[in-house]
UniProtKB/Swiss-Prot annotation:
Pfam families: HbrB (PF08539). It comes from Homo sapiens (Human). Belongs to the PROTOR family. Associated subunit of mTORC2, which regulates cell growth and survival in response to hormonal signals. mTORC2 is activated by growth factors, but, in contrast to mTORC1, seems to be nutrient-insensitive. mTORC2 seems to function upstream of Rho GTPases to regulate the actin cytoskeleton, probably by activating one or more Rho-type guanine nucleotide exchange factors. PRR5 plays an important role in regulation of PDGFRB expression and in modulation of platelet-derived growth factor signaling. May act as a tumor suppressor in breast cancer. The modification Phosphoserine is found at S252. The keyword Acetylation does not apply. Residues 12-31, 254-388 are annotated as: Disordered. This is Proline-rich protein 5. GO terms for biological process: cellular response to nutrient levels; cytoskeleton organization; negative regulation of apoptotic process; phosphatidylinositol 3-kinase/protein kinase B signal transduction; positive regulation of cell growth; positive regulation of phosphatidylinositol 3-kinase/protein kinase B signal transduction; TORC2 signaling. Most abundant in kidney and liver. Also highly expressed in brain, spleen, testis and placenta. Overexpressed in several colorectal tumors. Residues 10-95, 188-218 are annotated as: Interaction with RICTOR. It comes from the Eukaryota. Associated component of the mechanistic target of rapamycin complex 2 (mTORC2). Binds directly to MTOR and RICTOR within the TORC2 complex.
Length: 388
């Protein structure tokens, strides 16, 4: 009896329940089909609007607002994740083909003039309109502007015979070509420096001189044999990995010791006889590094390169430890006989970094050098040391 009762309550669903489920499933399927059809219609409207912009047709009134709403709706659907791929593979590719077909077979000066006109149209009309149409997509990387400029670089700038046109004698380069190359070289891809970017740099070197590229400084006379100073400095720091990388802050040897001596107050001589008390302040002198060799002019080159009566205290770069208080500066050097050898700025930077690498505690500077004998008895404690 109990088994029969269980079978009675565990009976299969009735036909009426099946009839109710079939219309619900059909309704869901119809809703899905309608949403897909609406999304396809939105895709088509965006496609037609973008192609019309590349074809110089423009957009009708209120069309920009409709396209913005369509982009917002697509981003909420399952097709929103493929929006960037669709923008690159469909819209931008077709648009660049439209612009390229007009100048594809041009050469020489005609290519330069036609490419300049194409860039003006793209940069002034097409690019702002693309950013306006896809305004809801802003904030995502890569941006619409970056994608459009990269496609223009690959599909137009690097696909035409621009290098041959620039290499011709007496070629007149329009200002728009220079602007185009400079704007495009400022756009970078997420994967770093690519072969297309290096090809673009070779074009920039033909119209901009000097030009600091990825592999060094270039000019119209040819590439220099050395890179910029900043590059050597960064490579030096990355190899050493010592105090400069770990502790880039300025440290004092004693945190209780100030970097400069306090200002001393004393009365001037003869002030007591007059009955008036005039206080004068003695300013603490801080010894600075001598002028680097590479930046000093040899004697006999005008007023800027002529040495006066002041002798050169030291002929080398700034040492890691300056002279102490008791050691006087070198005297008796003949400025007319001593010719300072020239040194490039990068060698000066290397020498300074070597002096930093040799001492783990930092660069010690003694502020007591160069003081007069009358100042020593007033200041008392002498020069103080600090670490740079």
């Amino acid at each position: 009896m109990r088994t029969l009762r269980r079978l009675k309550f565990m009976s299969s669903p009735s036909l009426s329940d099946l009839g109710k489920r079939e219309p619900a499933a059909a309704a869901d399927e119809r809703g899905t089909q309608q949403r897909r059809a609406c999304a396809n219609a939105t895709w088509n409207s965006i496609h037609n609007g973008v192609i019309a912009v590349f074809q110089r047709k423009g957009l009708p009134d209120q069309e920009l607002f409709s396209l913005n709403e369509g982009v917002r709706q697509l981003l909420k659907t399952e097709l929103g994740s493929f929006f960037t791929e669709y923008l690159q593979n469909q819209l931008l590719t077709k648009g660049m083909v439209i612009l390229r077909d007009k100048i594809r077979f041009y050469e020489g000066q005609k290519l330069l003039d036609s490419l300049a006109e194409t860039w003006d149209f793209f940069f002034s009309d097409v690019l702002p309109m693309l950013q306006a149409i896809f305004y809801p997509v802003q904030g995502k990387e890569p941006s619409v502007r970056q994608l459009a400029l990269l496609h223009f670089r690959n599909a137009i700038t690097l696909s035409v015979k621009l290098e041959d046109a620039l290499a011709r004698a007496h070629a007149r380069v329009p200002p728009a070509i220079v602007q185009m190359l400079l704007v495009l070289q400022g756009v970078h891809e997420s994967r770093g420096v690519t072969e297309d970017y290096l090809r673009l740099e070779t074009l920039v070197q033909k119209v901009v001189s000097p030009y600091l590229g990825t592999y060094g400084l270039h000019s119209s006379e040819g590439p220099f044999t050395h890179s910029c100073i900043l590059e050597k400095r960064l490579l030096r720091r990355s190899r050493s990995g010592d105090v400069l990388a770990k502790n880039p802050v300025v440290r004092s040897k004693s945190y209780n010791t100030p970097l400069l001596n306090p200002v001393q107050e004393h009365e001037a001589e003869g002030a007591a006889a007059g009955g008036t008390s005039i206080r004068r302040h003695s300013v603490s002198e801080m010894t600075s590094c001598p002028e680097p060799q590479g930046f000093s002019d040899p004697p006999g080159q005008g007023p800027t390169g002529t040495f006066r009566s002041s002798p050169a205290p030291h002929s080398g770069p700034c040492p890691s430890r300056l002279y102490p208080t008791t050691q006087p500066p070198e005297q008796g050097l003949d400025p007319t006989r001593s010719s300072l050898p020239r040194s490039s700025p990068e060698n000066l930077v290397d020498q300074i970094l070597e002096s930093v690498d040799s001492d783990s505690e930092g660069i010690f500077i003694d502020f007591g050098r160069g003081r007069g004998s009358g100042m020593s008895d007033l200041e008392g404690s002498g020069g103080r040391q600090s670490v740079v």
